[in-house]
Amino acid sequence: MSDVNKVVLAYSGGLDTSVILKWLQDTYQCEVVTFTADIGQGEELEPAREKARQFGVKEIYIDDLREEFVRDFVFPMFRANTVYEGEYLLGTSIARPLIAKRLIEIAQETNADAVSHGATGKGNDQVRFELGAYALNPNIKIIAPWREWDLLSREKLLAYAEKHGIPVEMKHRQGGSPYSMDANLLHISYEGRHLENPAAEAEEDMWRWTVSPERAPDEAEYLEIEYRNGDPISLNGKTLKPHELLAELNRLGGKHGIGRLDLVENRYVGMKSRGCYETPGGTILLKAHRAIESITLDREVAHLKDDLMPRYASMIYNGYWWSPERLALQALIDHTQQTVNGWVKLKLYKGNVIVTGRDSGTDSLFDPNIATFEDDAGAYDHRDAGGFIKLNALRLRIAANLRNKK
């Protein structure tokens, strides 16, 4: 294992990655560079710096990636109205390519010959991190401790930590959190423990970002989102940076019990997994984006996007953000968004996001003179519909005649 001289570790400062840090130093006899990403998880990150220093780490990166995360990853994904398996808004999946990108950049900056992560050998994240890393640097070495070591239980991790003087928070000594959680500006996820029984209802005190819809305010709240080229740029008339806008939508959505999801999903590695998610701001954005597209996109373009979306969602879920097919599809999606300009009004009420209005001063394809049920002064000739129907019925009539002859 002496071929590794320096490794960049995706480091949270928690129990798992702190054990990994020490394990890398001992097993590979290498220098470790730590990288901690701030993508809006809401945790204090400076303790990670202090922990890394305690292990003798000299190069410590703590990067605020919130703006880049929302601008270059979340918003491009939402231009496609992306949903995996009908429900999941891909909050964890979309964060991984950014972390992989920064790992590779830091490896280049520090002349490291390897990168490492704390994803387990059972999950999707190992695939996402590593596909991203190889796509950006095909010659990088990747160390995945969970696929190499024998510390496969919490008891073994704690024993290793105690043996090597790794600080352990009291919650871990007492059994740890009842859930495995992952958070960023788009969502927070919960897995493990009693959630592994898909028949068991999630406990109410699990949810952290949203109130129960039953306990949400009895009065609805209205908001208006302005779009430019498919991306939201302002909320209630105030222009905001992408990460600020999403954070405020998270606050508003959480207040009204919006964005809860209890899902059994198909992991890329082959198993089914139950997870619970809170995505309040993303749930609002999905509804708003579809609303502004409804009046600014040509019908066939909109339907084509809907046809392609599941494939696009799978690319992200499975870790192919940096693949040539995702980049090609993104170019098509972005082209369609040139006319997606205007505003959407929505009402938030007890877990529901209700569109109450939408308009575009520059790109609306809604023509009230044609769409009206009143006298349209000849804008639409009803007689044309007869020929349209006959031509579209031709193949149906031919098939019916054939059946009648049998």
UniProtKB/Swiss-Prot annotation:
SUPFAM superfamilies: Adenine nucleotide alpha hydrolases-like, Argininosuccinate synthetase, C-terminal domain. L-citrulline binds at Y88, S93, N124, R128, S180, S189, E265, Y277. One of its GO terms (biological process) is argininosuccinate metabolic process. Pfam families: Arginosuc_syn_C, Arginosuc_synth. One of its GO terms (cellular component) is cytoplasm. Homotetramer. This is Argininosuccinate synthase. It comes from Methylobacillus flagellatus (strain ATCC 51484 / DSM 6875 / VKM B-1610 / KT). The gene is argG.
